[in-house]
Amino acid sequence: MKVFQYEFPDMLIKVSNNRKYLEDLCAGKVYMNESGYFRKLEDTYRGDKFDGKCVISFENHTGEFMELGPEESPEERIKIPLDFIQNFTVGFKGDNKIPLYCCSQLSEHILRKETEFSLKFKEEFISEMEQFGSYYAIFSKVEFLQNMLDYIDDNQLGGKWGAVSYVDIHSEYHIEILNDENRNQYNVFFKKDLSYQWQNEWRIILVSSGAPLIGENDHHFVASIKPLSWFHIGHIRELRDNSIEIKEVDDSEVDGNVLRQ
C-alpha cells in the first residue's frame, strides 16, 4: 500500500471502550455485530439509519411513471405514477441480521505529513474515533483478512469485504436499480454517506447459504480465527500525541513499534 510516496503495510485500526474486547480480537475472537446494529443507534453520533440500505432518489428521474419488472417480460412490468411516490428506502429480507465487522483503514485520508520521515493522524479522524471509545488496536489487514478467509473456508460460508465508499447517499441510488437482477445485494453495506467519511472504514460481512448466522433473538456472532501475530493496543490519546516514523527496513524485518513518542 502506498501512503504519500512511502510503501506502507496495510493496517487496520479498531476502537472500543472495552480494552478486553480488543484483547479478544487479537487473540482470535472476532465479535461481529448484526448488520442492523447501527440503524438502532440512529439517534446517536454513531448511528446510521441507512447502513445497508438503498435510498431511492427520484430527483433526476424525468419520466412520469416508475416502471418495475423484468425487461424481457413486458407483460409483467407495472407502471406507478410518480405523483404517488416519494423517496423511499429499499432493503432485503434479513438485511439486519448479517454478521458485520468494521475497522478503520490506515491511509492518506486520515494522515498528514509531520516531517519528511514522520506522519501524524489528522485531528478529524481522532475526534471521530473518540466517539467510539478510549482504546484502540492496530494490526495487519493482510493477516486479519487471511485468518477470516480461512474461517470462511473452514465453515463453508460466503463473505464480502473491502473499503467503504463515501457518497451522497440521498442521490447515489436511482429507481432503475430495482430492475437490475444482476446487482449484488450486499454492495449496499460498502457505501455510506459522506458525513461518515472520517471513519475511513473497512468492513467484512459473512453470509450463510443455510440458516442465518445470527438468530432472531441474538445480536452478534463470534468468528473464532487464528490469533494475530502482530498487534498493538493502546489508549486513543496515543493517536494524537505520537507520530508514525518512517524508516527503511529489510523485507525480513518487522518493526512492531509503529507509534513512537
Model-derived segments and spans:
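NAD-dependent ADP-ribosyltransferases
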Residues: 1-261
